[in-house]
């Protein structure tokens, strides 16, 4: 019997009553029988953004297989039609090999294409929403396959109309890419590449540097970690909390609670909606949660390389992960009156 601990990058979670792997087309054929009243269905990708309960899951878990990516001309763009089960990083590497560099800043992000669309991934100045053409979705309420456009996805910071929605399943989608190099739009990446912001660099240069940065933070899947880097922090869901957005008034109160000058441009930035995005890692550190912190006797800990990652040090349970995450959110809320929002999807759990 398959368990969530086997199919998730965090490596926790109970057994699954029924586990199925199938292509998107096979899923559409079988779906009406799966989405029956009283039966739980969960469709997963790479399991890189999922925290499941230690209790047995009584329903069906479906993992979609990948299929060949189809490439076609679309006027000023090249259209890549990609299945939901395709590895995101494999897609990045594939497009780079063909001379399309736009996805290179998002190298090394674990999980699948479907998960990337649902979670609205972004990294180092690039975002999946910026190149999205369409999303193919199975609607379990109507048993039909429908197409979502960019507006239908209602993208927000690390979220979309399809995140945490069980009756709509992403089958695949299209990206609209242009060949050639891409400008470096993120300060940390520009510094690492030793170039000015806006400089056009080859996708290979960008990818190599992004993978190195992620490896230094312990934020790469184990199989992508370059030789010589530590792999002890790879059992995680990446960043466990999203960076909170606060009002400018709240930011003023926050300044009085932290050391003078601590709230600089490296930990805050203006949000596109007029608020201020604050580094969740900064809030954790200011609340006393150092890298490597763990509750006594627990195998769940904060990564020794990145303050926002909760890692499984070996044999951790979902209960231990939630216990640590709960302690963090309560402490940050009490100290700064800021509620941290978890980034991963919870199955059978609440924080």
Swiss-Prot record:
<dbReference type="GO" id="GO:0008360">
    <property type="term" value="P:regulation of cell shape"/>
</dbReference>
<dbReference type="InterPro" id="IPR006094">
    <property type="entry name" value="Oxid_FAD_bind_N"/>
</dbReference>
<dbReference type="InterPro" id="IPR036635">
    <property type="entry name" value="MurB_C_sf"/>
</dbReference>
<dbReference type="GO" id="GO:0009252">
    <property type="term" value="P:peptidoglycan biosynthetic process"/>
</dbReference>
<dbReference type="GO" id="GO:0071949">
    <property type="term" value="F:FAD binding"/>
</dbReference>
<comment type="similarity">
    <text>Belongs to the MurB family.</text>
</comment>
<dbReference type="GO" id="GO:0005829">
    <property type="term" value="C:cytosol"/>
</dbReference>
<dbReference type="InterPro" id="IPR016166">
    <property type="entry name" value="FAD-bd_PCMH"/>
</dbReference>
<feature type="active site">
    <location>
        <position position="158"/>
    </location>
</feature>
<keyword id="KW-0560">Oxidoreductase</keyword>
<protein>
    <recommendedName>
        <fullName>UDP-N-acetylenolpyruvoylglucosamine reductase</fullName>
        <ecNumber>1.3.1.98</ecNumber>
    </recommendedName>
</protein>
<keyword id="KW-0521">NADP</keyword>
<keyword id="KW-0132">Cell division</keyword>
<keyword id="KW-0131">Cell cycle</keyword>
<dbReference type="GO" id="GO:0008762">
    <property type="term" value="F:UDP-N-acetylmuramate dehydrogenase activity"/>
</dbReference>
<keyword id="KW-0963">Cytoplasm</keyword>
<keyword id="KW-0961">Cell wall biogenesis/degradation</keyword>
<dbReference type="Pfam" id="PF01565">
    <property type="entry name" value="FAD_binding_4"/>
</dbReference>
<keyword id="KW-0274">FAD</keyword>
<dbReference type="GO" id="GO:0051301">
    <property type="term" value="P:cell division"/>
</dbReference>
<keyword id="KW-0285">Flavoprotein</keyword>
<dbReference type="InterPro" id="IPR011601">
    <property type="entry name" value="MurB_C"/>
</dbReference>
<dbReference type="GO" id="GO:0071555">
    <property type="term" value="P:cell wall organization"/>
</dbReference>
<comment type="function">
    <text>Cell wall formation.</text>
</comment>
<dbReference type="InterPro" id="IPR003170">
    <property type="entry name" value="MurB"/>
</dbReference>
<keyword id="KW-0573">Peptidoglycan synthesis</keyword>
<comment type="pathway">
    <text>Cell wall biogenesis; peptidoglycan biosynthesis.</text>
</comment>
<dbReference type="InterPro" id="IPR016167">
    <property type="entry name" value="FAD-bd_PCMH_sub1"/>
</dbReference>
<dbReference type="Pfam" id="PF02873">
    <property type="entry name" value="MurB_C"/>
</dbReference>
<dbReference type="InterPro" id="IPR016169">
    <property type="entry name" value="FAD-bd_PCMH_sub2"/>
</dbReference>
<feature type="active site" description="Proton donor">
    <location>
        <position position="239"/>
    </location>
</feature>
<dbReference type="InterPro" id="IPR036318">
    <property type="entry name" value="FAD-bd_PCMH-like_sf"/>
</dbReference>
<feature type="domain" description="FAD-binding PCMH-type">
    <location>
        <begin position="11"/>
        <end position="213"/>
    </location>
</feature>
<keyword id="KW-0133">Cell shape</keyword>
<feature type="active site">
    <location>
        <position position="343"/>
    </location>
</feature>
């Amino acid at each position: 019997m398959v368990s969530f601990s086997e199919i998730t990058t965090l490596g926790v979670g109970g057994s699954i009553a029924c586990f199925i792997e199938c292509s998107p087309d096979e899923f559409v054929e079988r779906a009406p029988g799966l989405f029956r009243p009283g039966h739980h269905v969960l469709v997963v990708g790479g399991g890189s953004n999922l925290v499941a309960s230690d209790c047995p899951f009584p329903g069906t878990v479906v993992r979609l297989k990948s299929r060949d990516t189809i490439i076609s001309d679309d006027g000023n763009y090249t259209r890549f039609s990609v299945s939901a089960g395709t590895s995101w990083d494999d897609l990045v590497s594939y497009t780079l090999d063909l001379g399309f560099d736009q996805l290179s800043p998002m190298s090394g992000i674990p999980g699948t294409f479907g998960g990337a669309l649902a979670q609205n991934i972004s990294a180092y100045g690039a975002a999946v929403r910026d190149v999205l053409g369409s999303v193919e979705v199975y609607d379990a309420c109507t048993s039909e396959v429908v197409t979502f456009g960019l507006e239908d996805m209602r993208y927000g910071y690390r979220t979309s109309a399809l995140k945490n929605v069980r009756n709509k399943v992403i089958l695949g989608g299209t990206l609209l890419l242009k060949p050639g190099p891409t400008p470096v739009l993120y300060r940390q990446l520009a510094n690492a590449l030793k170039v000015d912001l806006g400089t056009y660099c080859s996708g290979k240069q960008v990818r190599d540097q992004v993978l190195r940065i992620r490896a230094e933070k312990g934020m790469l899947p184990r199989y992508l970690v370059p030789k010589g880097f530590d792999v002890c922090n790879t059992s995680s869901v990446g960043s466990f909390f999203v960076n909170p957005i606060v009002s400018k008034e709240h930011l003023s109160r926050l300044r009085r609670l932290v050391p003078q000058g601590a709230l600089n441009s490296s930990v805050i930035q203006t949000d596109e909606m007029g608020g201020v995005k604050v580094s969740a890692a900064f809030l954790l550190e200011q609340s006393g949660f150092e890298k490597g912190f763990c509750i006594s006797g627990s195998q769940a800990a904060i990564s020794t390389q990145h303050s926002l990652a909760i890692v499984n040090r070996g044999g951790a349970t979902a209960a231990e992960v939630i216990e640590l995450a709960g302690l963090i959110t309560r402490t940050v809320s009490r100290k700064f009156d800021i509620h941290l929002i978890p980034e991963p999807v919870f199955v059978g759990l609440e924080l």
